[in-house]
Amino acid sequence: MIQKNWEELIKPNKLEINPGHDAQRFATVVAEPLERGFGLTLGNALRRVLMSSLQGAAVTAVQIDGVLHEFSSIAGVREDVTDIILNIKQLALRLHAEGPKRMSLSKKGPGVVTAGDITAGADIEVLNPDLVLCTLDEGAEIRMEFTVALGKGYVASDRNRPEDAPIGLMPVDSLYSPVKRVSYKVENTREGQVLDYDKLTLQIETNGAITPDDAVAYAARILQDQLQTFVNFEEPEQKHVEESRPELEFNAALLKKVDELELSVRSANCLKNDNIVYIGDLIQKTESEMLRTPNFGRKSLNEIKEVLAQMGLHLGMEVPNWPPENIEELAKRYEDQY
């Protein structure tokens, strides 16, 4: 007999996302409670996936006018080509289309050449325009072309060299991961009378191409997909007994859970942390009440209003006798109506 104890293990009922001074790049994610030992298990797994497996964009090769190889120097340019390439590796990019794509740069001295001088086109965003690439003396000029592609993890320069590479094309080591740093710690936390559950705290820094909370969500999805391979049994289907359904006093759509809506990770987590489970809970909230929710901003509010409008609903509605005492049972009975 299969021991289905996974149904009995405690799952986190609290997920906090605390943005840093730059919410696009820094955040602390706290999940609790977890079974004893699961903080270390999940923290280590999430950290490894965050650092190695998320997709990002990076420069794969560069061409500089008048330069044949990376051990050259350029007249009037203070940095040698090796240093310029090291700076190019630090470019933070967001690619909005399938690669590879091209960027270019052309500038005359004197002055500092930064990432903001790059002409990237509509498909590429340069996220750190203040990054210094090189310095030009009076009368000096530099022209460069970059190849940008999507990938994951680290790819050495020799793997970025195409077979038909023209003379002067210099492949670059590519670090695709949009996540720069991840650390985690595990502490004890209390749930009811039990004092030794785990509390997992993740500190995440990205390059701005992805928010830390989205990065965690994608990493968790990767783990979920990989672990599904090891589930080698089928769970028996529960037999549903047809019963007469009582007539509802409200729209059956209110029984739908908010985590089934197509919301962003940030919006979904804000609702979860505010104990908003069903759409019926959500629509009774006013806009001002929602905006007082921690980490919930105008962008999330507009997103939720748009989703509700598609269902013919809006915030600030009144639902008499909500929630019904048998809400979970009703939600199962009427799930074919929403």
Curated annotation (Swiss-Prot):
Belongs to the RNA polymerase alpha chain family. The N-terminal domain is essential for RNAP assembly and basal transcription, whereas the C-terminal domain is involved in interaction with transcriptional regulators and with upstream promoter elements. It is an enzyme of class 2 (transferase). Residues 250-338 are annotated as: Alpha C-terminal domain (alpha-CTD). Keywords: DNA-directed RNA polymerase, Nucleotidyltransferase, Transcription, Transferase. Signal peptide: none annotated. It catalyses: RNA(n) + a ribonucleoside 5'-triphosphate = RNA(n+1) + diphosphate. GO terms for molecular function: DNA binding; DNA-directed RNA polymerase activity; protein dimerization activity. Pfam families: RNA_pol_A_bac (PF01000), RNA_pol_A_CTD (PF03118), RNA_pol_L (PF01193). InterPro entries: DNA-dir_RNA_pol_insert, DNA-dir_RNA_pol_RpoA/D/Rpb3, DNA-dir_RpoA, RBP11-like, RNAP_asu_C, RNApol_insert_sf. Residues 1-234 are annotated as: Alpha N-terminal domain (alpha-NTD). The keyword Calcium does not apply. It comes from Parvibaculum lavamentivorans (strain DS-1 / DSM 13023 / NCIMB 13966). GO terms for cellular component: cytoplasm; DNA-directed RNA polymerase complex. Homodimer. The RNAP catalytic core consists of 2 alpha, 1 beta, 1 beta' and 1 omega subunit. When a sigma factor is associated with the core the holoenzyme is formed, which can initiate transcription. NCBIfam families: PRK05182.1-2, PRK05182.2-5, rpoA. This is DNA-directed RNA polymerase subunit alpha. It comes from the Bacteria. Its EC number is 2.7.7.6. DNA-dependent RNA polymerase catalyzes the transcription of DNA into RNA using the four ribonucleoside triphosphates as substrates. The gene is rpoA. One of its GO terms (biological process) is DNA-templated transcription.
